[in-house]
Amino acid sequence: MDETVNIQMSKEGQYEINSSSIIKEEEFVDEQYSGENVTKAITTERKVEDDAAKETESSPQERREVKRKLKQRHIGMIALGGTIGTGLIIGIGPPLAHAGPVGALISYLFMGTVIYSVTQSLGEMVTFIPVTSSFSVFAQRFLSPALGATNGYMYWLSWCFTFALELSVLGKVIQYWTEAVPLAAWIVIFWCLLTSMNMFPVKYYGEFEFCIASIKVIALLGFIIFSFCVVCGAGQSDGPIGFRYWRNPGAWGPGIISSDKNEGRFLGWVSSLINAAFTYQGTELVGITAGEAANPRKALPRAIKKVVVRILVFYILSLFFIGLLVPYNDPKLDSDGIFVSSSPFMISIENSGTKVLPDIFNAVVLITILSAGNSNVYIGSRVLYSLSKNSLAPRFLSNVTRGGVPYFSVLSTSVFGFLAFLEVSAGSGKAFNWLLNITGVAGFFAWLLISFSHIRFMQAIRKRGISRDDLPYKAQMMPFLAYYASFFIALIVLIQGFTAFAPTFQPIDFVAAYISIFLFLAIWLSFQVWFKCRLLWKLQDIDIDSDRRQIEELVWIEPECKTRWQRVWDVLS
């Protein structure tokens, strides 16, 4: 009897087992055996299948595949947690100080429409081809290999540098309570903690982020309820606050740079618009998790559809109440003291006179930044893993543990955390600020290339004769929103360093503001020469099949929400 088993590897690293021996065994049973001999033949068949399975599990390709262990509730909360971060808690201070409560509110609403457009573009592509670090892969497939590699490396570097920022900030948050332990010690402690956490299988990361995001959601909803009560007069000896601070000092901020009132206010609003764009970064993180999502074509659209709710509730509503509780001329907004003291959330709580809440809120900030640091390593490692899988980085970076963790990519990402010591060293502040600028603008490039990729994606499927109505998720108002987002993101990238030109030109500030653009161009030109490729793929050469057909063959069975609490969390996530 022939007991050989042929194993064919697909593009996804999945395996198809052609067991010709099994067919021959069954035929042999029918013709020659009965009774005990049937049992013997079936045992032989199972042994062949088991040997094939073992060979499949131990294959080299299997050691390069992450696991689809993130459930729908994990995806929802990771997307939500990416929205509620340090950018929201700390980053809304400068817009409030420069543009005032109304100006800041308008800038966040406007940027909300831009990020909504980006997530719509991402949602349509990532549900069609759900792969790890999807938008760097999409840029490679729909635009060009050079742009895909550049986008991937810029995005990876941005999260590496952000990880260094979070490590330095964690120590500053603890200094709100005590300065007994030096900042450098906290950097080492949290680096070890966050790096080791990312060595566990992704399902544990999903559970951790689910719990942390739940705490952040409850805390933010609690703050909104608390703010509403204070605005209505709870605990206030001089009556309801209402719109008091919109009348005095006013609804519009003092502006910046120009002595002319209207011109200064406009520049202040432009500045707040750029700050809002930085603050919204992280809403695209659902695209990173696509390659590890179970049932991605159900989980990912659901997370994408709720972006509007998250923007309106957690950004706009929070900013609205903060604008009622904190005047734009509050000196704490420009505080150079303890990091968390300049948070408008903390200022509004302290101004209310509640003694216990500042400590509680500081604990929430600590948990939030810890979650952000954990996500920084996760995101960076998956981007680097994806680059390796697509032959854009050394092959060993895509090796994974039995649990599907790309451990070399995790270590290569987390090692950048030691740049946090630049914040501790005297005279290194300028260099650290340059790194932070690379972080912010690299996120803008990712948004820009998501929109460009979606435009090319729509053109490619139309050329193939595929209707967008047949896609797992159809983005709204396309292609208008893709062009809309592309235009304003490109504009923000160009004007985000405008303060370097006024009132006089500052060369150092100019380099700090635009170093990321120079870096992007340098990396792109290097890869363009390396690949010797076209600036853009021809439409007929765009690959929309790789990684897609394997997903279409898989079937996931989602457990139903049986208890009341499960249904509540299902709605929230």
Swiss-Prot record:
Q: Name one GO biological process term.
A: amino acid transmembrane transport
As for membrane topology, the entry says: Multi-pass membrane protein
Q: Which UniProt keywords apply?
A: Amino-acid transport, Membrane, Transmembrane, Transmembrane helix, Transport
Transmembrane regions listed in the UniProt entry: 74-93, 96-116, 154-174, 180-200, 210-230, 266-286, 307-327, 360-380, 404-424, 432-452, 478-498, 511-531
Pfam entry (one): AA_permease
Report one GO cellular component: membrane
Hey, which stretches end up on the Cytoplasmic side? 1-73, 117-153, 201-209, 287-306, 381-403, 453-477, 532-573
The annotated regions of Basic and acidic residues compositional bias extend over: 43-65
What is the superkingdom listed in this entry's lineage? Eukaryota
Segment Disordered: which positions? 40-66
* UniProt subcellular location: Membrane
Q: Which ranges does the record list as Extracellular topological domains?
A: 94-95, 175-179, 231-265, 328-359, 425-431, 499-510
Q: Which GO terms describe its molecular function?
A: amino acid transmembrane transporter activity; basic amino acid transmembrane transporter activity
This molecule's function is given as: High-affinity permease for basic amino acids.
> What is the similarity comment for this entry?
Belongs to the amino acid-polyamine-organocation (APC) superfamily. YAT (TC 2.A.3.10) family.
Can you name this protein? Basic amino-acid permease
Q: What's the source species for this entry? A: Saccharomyces cerevisiae (strain ATCC 204508 / S288c) (Baker's yeast)
Q: Identify the coding gene.
A: ALP1
